[in-house]
Amino acid sequence: MTEQGGEALYQVAVRALCEFSAKRGDLDLRFTPSPSALEGIAGHTLVTSRRPAHYQREVALDGRYRHLQVRGRADGYDPQANCLEEIKTHRGDLALQPANHRHLHWAQARVYGWLLCAERKLEEVELALVYLEVGNQKETRFVERVRADELRLFFESQCQAFLAWAEQELAHRQRRDRELAALRFPHAEFRHGQRQLAEAVYKAASAGCCLMAQAPTGIGKTIGTLFPQLKAMPGQRLDRLFFLAAKTPGRALALHALRSLEGETGGLPVRVLELVARDKACEHPDKACHGESCPLAQGFYERLPAARAAAVEARWLDQARLREVALAHRVCPYYLGQELARWCDLAVGDYNYYFDLGAMLHGLAQVNQWRVAVLVDEAHNLVERGRRMYSAELDQGDFLGVRKTAPEALRKPLERIQRAWNELAKTQADDYQAYDEPPQKLLLALQNAVAAINDLLAEQPQALEPALQEFYFAILQFGRLAELFGEHSLFDIEKRPGRNGRSLARLCLRNVVPAAFLAERFAASRSTVLFSATLGPRDYYADLLGLPAGTPWLEVDSPFSSEQLEVHIQRRVSTRYAQRQASLAPIAAILGEQFRQRPGNYLAFFSSFDYLQQALDVFRQAYPWVPCWSQTRRMDEAERRAFLERFVAGGEGIGFAVLGGAFGEGIDLPGERLIGAFIATLGLPQVNPVNEQIRLRMQSLFGDGYDYTYLYPGLQKVVQAAGRVIRSRSDRGVVHLIDDRFAQAKVRRLLPGWWQLR
């Protein structure tokens, strides 16, 4: 939204206008390999490079229709031929292109055509759809010559179809900003430390900068960041706010906090959308995403306008409400959510919706030139999540399985991969080795395989079985990250025994410093606030996350006193691997004695499932009268919920869990639901060849290899787990840190300052 001469105008991109008004038919996601974004850019560059010197590229155009301001860049215009071109890249036989795609492309060309005629006072113009096949680089042209008055009528019809929506959006935005400016904090007063956090968030939003905020567990960080950021939206002319969480509980807390802001009138003026993974939203997982298979894909774009209108009217669109709206209009809930990401004010979702290489929210913000603010919940998780997002892996065992069943057309390209792979494995003497760069011969073989699969799919769009399609996606990701390879990543090969005495190799492009990728996402937002109870040391997170130089770091004062939490260091126990067997009986005695002194609910954390099980067996034998329950491998949501439901006020028992797992952070067990924790580990990552390579890279980049690789990540998990105990100023509890290394001065300095260690 903008103002011109005191009049409010709704700005819309040509592409967004046409996608709103000109899409029709079924949702059709039958897999065909579209060109990548980089291939699309290269294709546009190639086509325009073939044009004469007077050819004009990226022609900026805009026009008005009542309250609409329509803007965009036409791909190219030849003034001597009076020909405007809309360029699209594709693969394979163009005859296989769905008709609704061509219809949309013509709509874009005609809108650009009118904007050009209006600006240059042309009576007519030749419009050309130019399709470039990225494999053979051949152009196919579809041409029509259209009078300006015809184009004007088409432009006005598209705008008219969008106008009622735009006027509704203008009214919503004005009301939203007016009511957000008057938004009141939902509680009678701020908690201790919460006002300090809220003021810092508001200042960062107003200044348009990033903020790192370390705030103790239990002060209400979620509402303490959401409230000031919402208040800042009108003054900063923000279009969207993204609340990003690492795990499902973080999303749930955000939605709960937003509900509290509705007040007695239920009048929170923002449209809230919860984004969930496709597999959790799909109504027909046994069907393919196209109209011939799934009833919710058939006629999707015909039914979308009514579903979209009902959804924005509802405003509150968590997973349950969105599903209700979607099914009422017989459209797919997941893809309705994807569409509504364009029209919500506040999206709540996983990190990957903004930070992943192909992230949807980031892409929408860029295409629509939104001014956005980003809140990153439990931001200490972004280091490891970022590393995973920007890494890629290829497993030779999976590849051999794919090769056995692949179509004949792929036999030779896959053989080339196998030969290159085997050569790598033969030259490597050790089971694990890191290299300075990815192997060029293998990368070339992968590129050839991608081209061959593309050719196959261009002729047979449904030719890939699931395993081959998954491998195709894997080599695409591997190739993309190989192009971006730098000192932020490692390339390593790990060998393991296979059949017949042969070894199999796993190749990994392993990102270890996500800063280079994340920095661009921070730069794309007006303001980003990263908050967590464990966001220190400051330099560690600033270095690995790529925050702008000078990003302020806030440590919020703890509202809790040392009298609330007894912290005991058990100096006579070592949980090092070599001493684990000897540690089991002393650990059982510590747990049993604490439970005898003060019966209640406790959590006991261990470094692995094996260690947990050994400790549990010894404890049960020594204290059979103490109720116990334990975390198990690969628990589903129902099992995790059942584990937590054992922690009831007035209850007694000890839950055994793995440090860094589902119960070490992001759970809220206030009051008597949890009165203590035992942490029998420093949480240090395992010393292995991979982590040792990471340590060497951290040392060369930051001069602090051991701490960056082992100590800081480990103690972050310890502090998070201990933070489950004290959730309010009325709580009282105890934490036992079971390992002699907790007494080391270097380790003690990294523990919360308000703890009084005993």
Model-derived features: positions:
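Conserved RecA-like P-loop NTPase helicase motor core
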Residues: 571-582, 632-742
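Walker A/P-loop
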Residues: 206-228
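Signature of the SF2 helicase/ATPase Hel1-core->accessory helical subdomain module
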Residues: 225, 231, 252, 329-346, ...
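Conserved pre-motif I regulatory segment
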Residues: 172-214
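A contiguous, basic/glycine-rich beta-loop/short-helix subdomain that forms a polymer-engagement track
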Residues: 322-347, 357-365, 455-574, 582-583, ...
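Metal-dependent nuclease catalytic cores that hydrolyze phosphodiester bonds in DNA/RNA
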Residues: 1-82, 107
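Mg2+/Mn2+-dependent nuclease catalytic core
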Residues: 61-155
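A substrate-engagement module of RecA-like helicase motors
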Residues: 178, 184, 237-347, 352-355, ...
